[in-house]
Amino acid sequence: MAKAELMDYDEAIEMFEPVLGFEVHVELNTRTKMFSDAPNFFGGEPNTNITPVDLGLPGSLPVVNEQAVKHSISLGLALGCEIAPSSRFARKNYFYPDLAKNYQISQFDEPIAFRGSVEVEMPDGRIVTVPIERAHMEEDAGKLTHVGGATGRIQGADHSLVDYNRAGVPLVEIVTDIIYGAEGEAPELAKAYVSTIRDIVVALGISDAKMERGNLRCDANISLSPRGSGKLGTRTETKNVNSLRSVERAIRYEIQRQAAILAAGGTITQETRHWHEDTGRTSAGRPKSDADDYRYFPEPDLLPVQPSAELIEELRAALPEAPAIRRRRLKAEWGFTDLEFQDVVNSGLLTELVDTVEAGAAPQAARKWWTGEIARIANARGVDAATLISPTQVASVIELVEAGTLTNRLARDVIEGVIDGEGTAQEVVDARGLAVVSDDGPLIEAIDAALQAQPDVLAKIRDGKVQAAGAVIGAVMKAMRGQADAARVRELVLERAQAS
């Protein structure tokens, strides 16, 4: 659909109520796969981290990964879910090249966790409670690479390659209940929800949750209901959403696309759709299947999972501080205003800020550098700020500023030098000769020259108009190439003005 066929977003919200639902797939950090002893790690040569179980070869039998079960229970508890005293695996039957067995071992009517909720903080600081229907265990599928098509898509591809290294990797799929009431903030809620899930699994230590690697993937369901109709619309499920920004953009696009179709008297097809980051659009995939289409039946080769009450309580006691509670604590400890803390949260750099403070930096200084200069450089280079420089490196720059070795202006140059791989903060200072001049001699020479060049300013200072000293201070800082402490320069300017 062309951009011109999209309805204006505000107009779409006036006419329709968006109804949301999310399925978030979290790859678990375990040594081996869900049902085999094949190693579980990202990368590796294609089709090397596999066993007969992963390929569904005759005679091979699955064995449940105990650590994956524990991780799944921990996640369920963190989501406020009830943990099932007995849950069962099921075969989800469908045919696709990345599924060697032609079925996926998942869970159907007896998931490991159910009926929970998660608090989501919106950009304006409001808390929205998102209902969780269930969290269930399953194995991942392989990965297809389409050759010859545009930007790796299947459309127009000459052929496809399949890598089964990912097949059998343990997953937890978190399924929300129907989410009403998001209104015009539906895209922002979608982004905030996925961000919250990412924060939770990282805090638990059960997943790297790197969306660019597929550790965490989101399928976003969206339908529109005409205002006042009281009826649910036909939903679409948008797949291939692999960044927080994409989640927000995909929801906004689908609302505009569906609204345009409905307003023109058309109907929405229940289907999966694929998000394309390069075009900012979704495209039709396949008709959306219902549960009956997958012909679920109990997995005959696996016994039910029946965790003891003692194990559940042991895992509950080991849960870390919830991310939402942690954020409130940090805000109070750091003394940030609501606006300052929200700025950090919205930047996605809270973890980096925490690590920088733990490395010895003052919270306000850490906030200023991460959300200011470092974010500016990251935006200019089109990369994630967290990939540019480490919290320890930032803390070392802040330490040099606090010690008086650097001014803020010089520190910006040092930050760029560290980012460009010129060495540690101190090494960049030494190599570039950026340290603040601590000897008053060169400062006095520059001040005297500036005063002589601006006799009118000198006269004003002598008459008690000390604010006029700013012109001299600026000239001195320029002459010293910023390598001077402005406060010390001001003191000396006032002294020399009266003495000359």
UniProtKB/Swiss-Prot annotation:
Biological process terms in GO annotation: glutaminyl-tRNAGln biosynthesis via transamidation; translation
Catalytic activity: L-glutamyl-tRNA(Gln) + L-glutamine + ATP + H2O = L-glutaminyl-tRNA(Gln) + L-glutamate + ADP + phosphate + H(+); L-aspartyl-tRNA(Asn) + L-glutamine + ATP + H2O = L-asparaginyl-tRNA(Asn) + L-glutamate + ADP + phosphate + 2 H(+)
EC number(s) reported in the record: 6.3.5.-
Pfam families named among the record's database cross-references: GatB_N, GatB_Yqey
Keyword Protein biosynthesis included in the entry's annotation: yes
Superkingdom assignment: Bacteria
Function of the molecule: Allows the formation of correctly charged Asn-tRNA(Asn) or Gln-tRNA(Gln) through the transamidation of misacylated Asp-tRNA(Asn) or Glu-tRNA(Gln) in organisms which lack either or both of asparaginyl-tRNA or glutaminyl-tRNA synthetases. The reaction takes place in the presence of glutamine and ATP through an activated phospho-Asp-tRNA(Asn) or phospho-Glu-tRNA(Gln).
Name of the protein this chain belongs to: Aspartyl/glutamyl-tRNA(Asn/Gln) amidotransferase subunit B
Organism: Clavibacter michiganensis subsp. michiganensis (strain NCPPB 382)
Encoding gene, per UniProt annotation: gatB
